[in-house]
């Protein structure tokens, strides 16, 4: 039996639709919103509606943007010879935090996952191939180091093989500060595979 009015239950239900938000967290968020002053609730709602109405995908790379092309694609200081392929726009934010990559990006908006019913035609691989031109010299595959990410990387490498472009995969391995004792066999294998000369 629920103890909240229908409007609160609906708010909880909507928050629970968000990724990684369970019923308890959704309840806390809903109750927090209800305890905010009206002007803060209006600001929150306005920001949500404005973001949904103005943010779109960059027609070049697929990143979130409010201009087209996005700030990264239109930046003349970016290295146009290197394209880093990621699964989601949030992965670009993660890569940019590292401040080690100065090339362009390509967002697949997913991965190949037969178990989820997603094939190569369901993600932005055709668009990646269309971006291969005289300027593109290297494609870095930075898909997630899981079964779907590996399958996606292997498929893209196969598709790009006939083209005159170098295809590399980011190394996977032991995290900094991690202990070998806790690493699984696949992680250790990838760490050995991706080793560099020092």
Curated annotation (Swiss-Prot):
It holds the Pfam family Toprim_4. A zinc finger (C4-type) spans 58-73. This is Recombination protein RecR. The keyword Ion transport does not apply. NCBIfam families: recR (TIGR00615). PROSITE patterns: RECR, TOPRIM. InterPro entries: DNA_Rcmb_RecR, Rcmb_RecR, Rcmb_RecR_Znf, TOPRIM_dom, TOPRIM_RecR. One of its GO terms (biological process) is DNA repair. Transmembrane segments: none annotated. The keyword Membrane does not apply. GO terms for molecular function: DNA binding; zinc ion binding. Keywords: DNA damage, DNA recombination, DNA repair, Metal-binding, Zinc, Zinc-finger. Residues 81-175 form the Toprim domain. May play a role in DNA repair. It seems to be involved in an RecBC-independent recombinational process of DNA repair. It may act with RecF and RecO. Belongs to the RecR family. SMART domains: TOPRIM. It comes from the Bacteria.
